[in-house]
Every structure is written in C-alpha cells, then in structure tokens.
C-alpha cells in the first residue's frame, strides 16, 4: 500500500530530521518553505523517483477544462564536455513552474505571450509515481495548484484549498468557543463518486450518446425494469473481476484506500 507515493513515512526515512520537521511545519501550518529546505526535499524526491524507475517529472494540476494537465520535464541536464550527464532537480523546480496558459481556452481575450500561468507545489498532497503512456517508463507527478500572475485561480484545486482553509479557520474558532484548546487543525475529507457504470469498450464505441455526453440518451427500457437480479446484485463476470483487481492494485500503490 502506497509503495509509489512519497508519503510521510518515506519523508521521515529519507529526509534529515531538521528538514523533515520544517516541511511538516509547512504542511500543517501553511508556513513558507525556505529555499534551502526545498532543495533538500527536491534532491531526496528525485533520488527516490529514480530508484523507482522515473526519468521525468511533471507539475500535475487540474485546469478548468475538466481534465488534468501535465508537462513532462526530464531529470537529465545538458551533457558535460566528457559526454556524461547529470540528473538534477532543484527546489526551485519543485516549488514553482511556469506552464504556458495560452494552451488553454481564453476566448481570444489576451495575446498569447501575455497568457501567464504558474504552478505552485501543493505540499499537503504527496508526490507519486505513475507509468507513462507506453507502460515501460515512469514519471514523478508533483501535485500543484495553477494560478495567474495576480493570484486568480485557474484550476479546480486552488478553490478547494482555499475552502479547506476557510473551514479550518471557522471550525477552530467554534472549537475554542466549546472549550477545546488543543486542536490545531480541522481537515475535511473529500472523495470520488463511489458508484459508476462499467461498459465494454466495443459496445461503448457504438454509442455516440455515451461518447459525447457520458450518459444514455436513447435506447429501450429493460424488459422488466429492475425487478430481476441482473443489476446491483448480479453475478460478477470474470472480466469485470479482473478489471477491478487491476484497479484496486493500482489505487493501493498510490495510497488510495479504495473500498
């Protein structure tokens, strides 16, 4: 469980005690992370990722397009005179990135070169490793927020983080009124939808309504509605069981406690 996640136990094991303590302080209290601390964290994160087979890293964020966005950069720097290369990853590269915001829809309101967007490392979410599109390589994913030059949220995560901070502030205020003087933080829990429909790819590609809208817009009702046992409590077919086995294993590797 969590073998592909740079989680708290990995950080505690690999980071110097002072660095680990400062990073935890940043995570828990929202304090600014010093550059020297970020450099050490970046180095250990890179070494851990390389040991896991990663060659690239990505600032991973959720823009307002409804999908995730990522830009892959290699750990390998320019070759030296002897032809050898260095595997580098600095604290500056960890903490902040500058993807081109002109890659996203703007309605033509701004010139391309003025569409500035910045990714900022969200250290409250652990970095993780996933296989690349070929299935043979691996990429270090660094969860980030995506903001404009003046601080406007350009993604789904920034409003979530700000909402969590607002809830924390007011919940702590209420706890103090009730006499609780020990709690330091209130953290809400959010999760993905627990119910979904699994459709065979061959059948899915024949249904334009599913492709374009994600739901059924036409088709006949079942002969008996839902009176039979072929829906929620039907027998699980072998292909579906194997699919769920793969899903569970991949989620567990990423530290997701799928039920």
Predicted feature descriptions by range:
Residues 116-259:
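Glycine-rich, acidic/polar active-site loops that bind/position phosphate-bearing ligands
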Residues 2-90, 95-114:
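Histidine/acidic residue-rich metal-binding segments in metalloenzymes
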């Amino acid at each position: 469980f969590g073998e592909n996640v740079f989680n708290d136990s990995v950080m505690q094991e690999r980071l110097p005690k002072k660095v680990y303590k400062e990073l935890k302080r940043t995570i828990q209290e929202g304090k600014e992370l010093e550059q020297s601390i970020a450099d050490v964290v970046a180095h250990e994160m890179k070494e851990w990722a390389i040991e896991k087979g990663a060659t690239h890293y990505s600032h991973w964020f959720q823009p307002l397009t409804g999908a995730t966005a990522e830009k892959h950069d290699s750990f390998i720097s320019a070759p030296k005179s002897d032809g050898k290369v260095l595997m580098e990853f600095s604290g500056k590269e960890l903490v902040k990135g500058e993807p081109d915001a002109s890659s996203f829809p703007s309605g033509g309101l701004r010139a391309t070169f003025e569409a500035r967007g910045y990714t900022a490392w969200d250290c409250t979410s652990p970095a993780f490793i996933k296989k690349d599109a070929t299935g043979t390589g691996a990429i270090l994913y660094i969860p980030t927020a995506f903001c404009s030059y003046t601080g406007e949220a350009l993604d789904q995560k920034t409003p979530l983080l700000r909402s969590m901070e607002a809830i924390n502030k007011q919940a702590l205020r209420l706890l103090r009124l009730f006499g609780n003087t020990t709690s330091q933080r209130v953290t809400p829990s959010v999760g993905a939808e627990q119910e979904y429909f699994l459709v065979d790819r061959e059948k899915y590609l024949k249904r334009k309504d599913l492709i374009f809208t994600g739901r059924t817009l036409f088709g006949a009702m079942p002969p008996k509605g839902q009176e039979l046992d072929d829906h929620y409590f039907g027998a699980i077919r072998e292909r579906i069981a194997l699919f769920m086995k793969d899903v569970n294993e991949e989620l567990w590797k990423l530290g997701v406690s799928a039920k």
